[in-house]
């Protein structure tokens, strides 16, 4: 994200402060959202959050699709990055508080600890594949301006930089649908076991 913002919004962009938007929104909203979803199942809360993730990525993609800056003194790239991060933080508020609860409910009695340990496998895999994919996409759609002789040549090469976010929106949508299917399948299996 920092390289994308600096390359698209310019060297004067300061993406460091944008990273603070996520924890700010989470701290402000997690209690309210947790209370709001308290009567719902953990999987329902998680699914709401999972379907917010692709919306977040699509908002981030809108940054260089908009015309003139919407807010004076702030590039649309920065504005839409903030909007996307806000939605992503809201998704986190729906997912995180109920995530471990859901995994512990899936575990057979006495194996909760092992299941909770494996619940973090996604973080490990996403850090490997996500960072690699981000680097490949950044190189393809938003290359380093230093590699070009003119600003115009770089602008032509990075004209579709927003495509990066479409990949992440697609991954988020696939993950949301996969979680929904997983919940339906495990619910069906659990019903058969009770019969």
What name fits each language-model region?
Residues 70-95:
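Hydrophobic core of transmembrane alpha-helices in multi-pass small-molecule transporters
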Residues 12-13, 78-79, 104-122:
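Loop-to-transmembrane helix entry/capping segments in MFS-fold secondary transporters
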Residues 5, 93-108:
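Intracellular juxtamembrane helix-capping segments at the cytosolic ends
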Residues 136-173:
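A membrane-interface helix-boundary motif in multi-pass transporters
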Residues 28-48:
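Helix-to-loop junctions at the C-terminal end of transmembrane segments
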Residues 3-27, 48, 79-82, 159-166:
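Loop-to-transmembrane helix entry
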Residues 51-73:
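C-terminal ends and interior cores of transmembrane alpha-helices
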Residues 62-64, 158-195:
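Multi-pass alpha-helical transporter architecture, strongest
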């Amino acid at each position: 994200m920092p390289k994308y913002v600096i390359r698209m919004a310019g060297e004067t962009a300061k993406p460091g402060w944008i990273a603070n938007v996520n924890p700010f929104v989470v701290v402000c909203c997690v209690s309210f959202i947790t209370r709001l979803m308290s009567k719902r199942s953990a999987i329902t809360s998680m699914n709401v959050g999972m379907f917010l993730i692709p919306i977040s990525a699509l908002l981030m993609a809108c940054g260089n699709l908009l015309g003139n800056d919407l807010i004076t003194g702030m590039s649309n790239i920065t504005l839409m990055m903030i909007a996307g991060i806000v939605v992503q933080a809201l998704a986190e508020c729906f997912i995180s508080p109920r995530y471990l609860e859901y995994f512990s409910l899936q575990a057979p009695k006495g194996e909760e600890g092992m299941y909770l340990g494996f619940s973090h496998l996604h973080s490990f895999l996403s850090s490997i594949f996500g960072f690699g994919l981000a680097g490949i996409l950044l190189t393809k759609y938003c290359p380093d301006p230093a590699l070009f002789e003119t600003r115009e040549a770089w602008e032509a090469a990075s004209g579709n930089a927003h495509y990066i976010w479409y990949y992440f929106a697609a991954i988020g949508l696939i993950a949301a649908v996969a979680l929904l299917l997983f919940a339906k399948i495990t619910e069906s299996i659990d019903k058969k076991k009770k019969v």
